[in-house]
Amino acid sequence: MAMDRERIVDEALALLNEVGIDKLSTRKLAERLGVQQPALYWHFKNKSALLDAVNSAMLARYHTNRPQPGQDWVEFTYANARSIRSTLLAVRDGARLTAGTRPSTAEFADTEAVLQLYVDAGFSASEAFGIAISITRYVVGYVLEEQGERERDLLDSDADAQSDPMAEVAPYPLLSEALRSLVNLGTINTEQVFESGLTDMVEGMQVRLRGKM
C-alpha cells in the first residue's frame, strides 16, 4: 500500500489510541507502517508537525459542530463546547494532543464562521475571539483532568483505591459539604460539573453583551 500523508496520520491516530501520547514515537509509527523512520520526514519535518496533523485529523473526524445561518449564539456555544469535549474524549490523550499543537490553515474558515456568529450577536471581533479561545481552553483543561483521572485510576494501588475521600477532608467542613454530593457520583469530573462551569461562562458573556446594548 502506498504511503501518503493521510495514511501516516491515520496510523498515527490509531497508534495514539493504543499506546498514548507519551509512548507515541516516529520509530514505532515507522515500524507500524513497515518503513524506515527517515521515510516519515518526507511528509513531516518533525514529530511536532506530525502531531499537528493528527490533531487536525481528530477534529475533522469527530468535531462536526459548525455554526448554522441564523443560529443563536448561546445555543451554538453550548453545542460547540460539548462537541469539543466529546471529540477529545473520543481519542486517548486527546486533550494533551490538542493542548500541544497548532491549528492548521484548514481550520481558519471554521474559526472565521464562529467569530462571525458572535460579531453578528453584538460582540466585537476581539471579544468574539476571546470567547472562542476561553471556551476551547475551558474544555481542554476540563478534559485534561478527566483523562488524567482515568490514567491515575489505572495506576492506583488497591490500598489507594480503598481510601475514603470523605475521611480525608473531614477536618474541613466547607470542603466536606461541597464534595459530599460528588462522592456519590464517584468523581469530581462529571457531566454535571462540566455543564455548571460552562453555564457560568455563558451567563457571564450574556451579562457583557447586555452591557453593550
Question: Residues of each region from the PLM?
Answer:
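Short, Lys/Arg-enriched anionic-surface-contact patches
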Residues: M1-D4
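Helix-turn-helix
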Residues: R7, E11, L15-A49, A53
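Amphipathic alpha-helical interaction segments
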Residues: A49, A79, A113, G130-R137, ...
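Short, basic, alpha-helical segments at the C-terminal edge of helix-turn-helix-like DNA-binding modules
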Residues: A57-R61
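Hydrophobic alpha-helical connector segments
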Residues: T64-F108, A125-A128, A132-I135
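Hydrophobic alpha-helical bundle segments that form small-molecule/ligand-binding pockets
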Residues: D110-D164, M205-M213
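C-terminal peripheral helix-coil segments that are non-catalytic and often amphipathic
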Residues: G148-M213
